[in-house]
Structures are given as C-alpha cells and as structure tokens.
Amino acid sequence: MFLLHEYDIFWAFLIISSIIPILAFLISGVLAPLSEGPEKFSSYESGIEPMGDAWLQFRIRYYMFALVFVVFDVETVFLYPWAMSFDVLGVSVFIEALIFVLIPIVGLVYAWRKGALEWS
C-alpha cells in the first residue's frame, strides 16, 4: 500500500527547488536598477553596429557532423552506467551493449561509404 508520508522529503525538495528560482528572479527584478535609454531598446547593445546581413546559410555538412556527434554522444551517456556495473551484469548484458554499439557504427560506415562525411 502506498503511504504518502514516504514522499514528504520529495515534495519538500520539489517545493523548495521551485521557490528558490522564483525568489531569485523576483529579488533581482526588485533590486536591479532601472536603466532605460535608446541603447537598451536596440537589438544589439554592445556599442558596435553589426555589419552585413545577420542571416547566414550553413552548409549541410555541418549538420551531418553534428548529427553523428550527437548520436555517439548519447550512446556514450547510455554506456557509462553499463561500464560502471560491468562486473555485476554478466555476459548477456555485454552482448546487448555490443549490439547497442554496433548499430550506430554500421550507420557511420554507411554514411562514410555514401560520402556524407566528405568535406569537399
């Protein structure tokens, strides 16, 4: 049976962690000096006027490299807990992790052979 008093610490932590950022924003809004002027209403207020067009079109190659990086980065995040408990889990989990690693590697080899990672 669920006993709600078991979660008192969780609810207290949730309420306190919600109140602290709200109080920080309220206090900074009250104590911050009001600085109004034409510089504050411009879209670029560092004092240097931007030159040229702000819209730049990126090459699709950047997105391909970013996508490959994100895939392997997320895979690393999932493999870290497995590596920390490798001695406890056994061989079956090792085979599952090996398959988990091989699937993105097959995708990387496919992208490499199709020329998706070529820079020229």
From Swiss-Prot:
Question: Which reactions are catalysed by this chain?
Answer: a plastoquinone + NADH + (n+1) H(+)(in) = a plastoquinol + NAD(+) + n H(+)(out); a plastoquinone + NADPH + (n+1) H(+)(in) = a plastoquinol + NADP(+) + n H(+)(out)
Coiled coil residues, start to end:
none
Recorded GO MF terms: NADH dehydrogenase (ubiquinone) activity; quinone binding
Keywords (alphabetical) are: Chloroplast, Membrane, NAD, NADP, Plastid, Plastoquinone, Quinone, Thylakoid, Translocase, Transmembrane, Transmembrane helix, Transport
In which broad location class does this protein mainly occur, judging by the first location in its UniProt entry?
A: plastid
- The broad enzyme category this protein falls into is translocase
Q: Is Thylakoid there in the keyword field?
A: yes
Q: Which InterPro entries match?
A: NAD(P)H_OxRDtase_bac/plastid, NADH_UbQ/plastoQ_OxRdtase_su3, NDAH_ubi_oxred_su3_sf
Keyword check for Translocase, yes or no.
yes
- Disulfide linkages recorded for this protein, renumbered to the chain, are none
Q: Enumerate the transmembrane spans.
A: 9-29, 64-84, 88-108
Q: How does it sit in the membrane?
A: Multi-pass membrane protein
Give the matching PANTHER family: NADH-UBIQUINONE OXIDOREDUCTASE CHAIN 3
Under HAMAP family, the record lists: NDH1_NuoA
Subunit and partners? NDH is composed of at least 16 different subunits, 5 of which are encoded in the nucleus.
| Similarity comment text for this entry | Belongs to the complex I subunit 3 family.
**The protein's name in its UniProt record:** NAD(P)H-quinone oxidoreductase subunit 3, chloroplastic
Specify the species.
Ceratophyllum demersum (Rigid hornwort)
Source species taxonomy: Eukaryota, Viridiplantae, Streptophyta, Embryophyta, Tracheophyta
